Each structure stands twice: as structure tokens, then as C-alpha cells.
């Protein structure tokens, strides 16, 4: 009789255990699915955070590089005027004029150094080079037998860019078919 009780108790324990496992299996499956979903969300969120960080770093770098663009555009005319003044210096002049010209040259050189330090580059196309609408602004087309069509025949004003961004296109005249 004790053996029967033990067997009945064992059977009852086994039945209860099976019942618990049967009830727990869907919960375990559900919890495993939830864990997988959470892992997937974590991976996606981590990737999104990483992409956002990269975008912000790029935006910060661009802002730093191009923050001076508006100010630099205004200085371009100063550089042009200094170049024009130096291009028209008199051949024979007294000491005062020579000193003024030297001062203008030093100012132009210092401005060029500042431009270089801030990655501002002059666009000065060669005569005869081909017109590039990304860098040049054609103000006129002139028939010219010595030049290919769309080649630059006159540089009217230098252009400038800061890194890869155009500040001002070079103003040119281009040849057209005759």
C-alpha cells in the first residue's frame, strides 16, 4: 500500500510537472520571441544612434569649415582690389609710392595666407582651357579662330572656393564657333 501511494504520488508529481511544462512552454516560447525582438530593437537602435552620431560629426565639421564662407565672400572683393592696385603700379615712382606699393603687396600676401589657412583657394583658369560650368561663369561668347569652341579666351575675374564649395565662380569669356 505504501508502494501504491508512492507510485500514485510519483504519478501525480509527474502529471503536475507535465502540466507545468505544458503551461510554461508557450510562455517560454513567447519570452524567447520577446527577447529576440528586444535584441533586434537594440541592434537597430544602436545602429541608428551610430548613424546619428556620424551625421552630427559631419554636420559639425561642415559647419566649422563653411562658417566663414559669408565673411570670406566679402573679403574676395578686397583681394581683387589689392590685386588691381598691384597690377597698375607705376614703373618709375618716388620712394613714397614705392613704400605704399610695398604695403599693398604685404597686405595682399597676408590676406592670401589667411585664405590658405582657411582652405580658400583661388580659381584662375588658364587661357585656352575648357569652360567648366561648375567653376566658371561665362559673361560672353566671342568668335575666335585661334581657340576651340567653349575654351576660355579671357579671364575677367578670378573665382574662389572653400574646400569643395564654390564661393564665387571665375568670370570668363569663351570662344564660340566662327
Curated annotation (Swiss-Prot):
InterPro entries: GrpE (IPR000740), GrpE_coiled_coil (IPR013805), GrpE_head (IPR009012)
GO cellular component, one term: cytoplasm
Transmembrane segments: none
Xref: Pfam families: GrpE
Main location: cytoplasm
Keyword Nucleus: no
Keywords: Chaperone, Cytoplasm, Stress response
Compartment list: Cytoplasm
Domain of life: Bacteria
GO molecular function per UniProt: adenyl-nucleotide exchange factor activity; protein homodimerization activity; protein-folding chaperone binding; unfolded protein binding
An annotated GO BP: protein folding
Cited SUPFAM superfamilies: Coiled-coil domain of nucleotide exchange factor GrpE, Head domain of nucleotide exchange factor GrpE
Subunit-level organization: Homodimer.
Main function: Participates actively in the response to hyperosmotic and heat shock by preventing the aggregation of stress-denatured proteins, in association with DnaK and GrpE. It is the nucleotide exchange factor for DnaK and may function as a thermosensor. Unfolded proteins bind initially to DnaJ; upon interaction with the DnaJ-bound protein, DnaK hydrolyzes its bound ATP, resulting in the formation of a stable complex. GrpE releases ADP from DnaK; ATP binding to DnaK triggers the release of the substrate protein, thus completing the reaction cycle.
Family according to the record: Belongs to the GrpE family.
Protein name listed in UniProt: Protein GrpE
Source organism: Rickettsia akari (strain Hartford)
Phylogenetic placement of the source organism: Bacteria, Pseudomonadati, Pseudomonadota, Alphaproteobacteria, Rickettsiales
Amino acid at each position: 500500500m505504501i508502494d501504491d501511494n508512492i507510485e500514485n504520488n510519483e504519478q501525480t508529481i509527474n502529471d503536475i510537472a507535465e502540466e507545468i511544462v505544458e503551461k510554461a512552454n508557450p510562455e517560454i516560447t513567447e519570452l524567447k520571441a520577446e527577447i529576440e525582438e528586444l535584441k533586434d530593437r537594440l541592434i537597430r537602435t544602436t545602429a541608428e544612434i551610430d548613424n546619428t552620431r556620424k551625421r552630427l560629426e559631419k554636420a559639425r565639421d561642415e559647419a566649422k569649415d563653411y562658417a566663414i564662407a559669408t565673411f570670406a565672400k566679402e573679403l574676395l572683393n578686397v583681394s581683387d582690389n589689392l590685386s588691381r592696385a598691384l597690377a597698375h603700379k607705376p614703373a618709375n615712382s618716388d620712394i613714397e609710392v614705392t613704400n605704399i606699393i610695398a604695403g599693398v603687396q604685404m597686405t595682399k600676401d597676408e590676406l592670401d595666407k589667411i585664405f590658405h589657412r582657411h582652405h580658400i583657394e583661388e580659381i584662375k583658369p588658364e587661357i585656352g582651357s575648357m569652360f567648366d560650368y561648375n567653376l566658371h561663369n561665362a559673361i560672353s561668347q566671342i568668335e575666335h579662330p585661334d581657340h576651340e569652341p567653349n575654351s576660355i579666351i579671357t579671364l575677367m575675374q578670378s573665382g574662389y572656393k572653400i574646400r569643395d564649395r564654390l564661393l564665387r565662380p571665375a568670370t570668363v569669356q569663351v570662344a564660340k564657333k566662327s
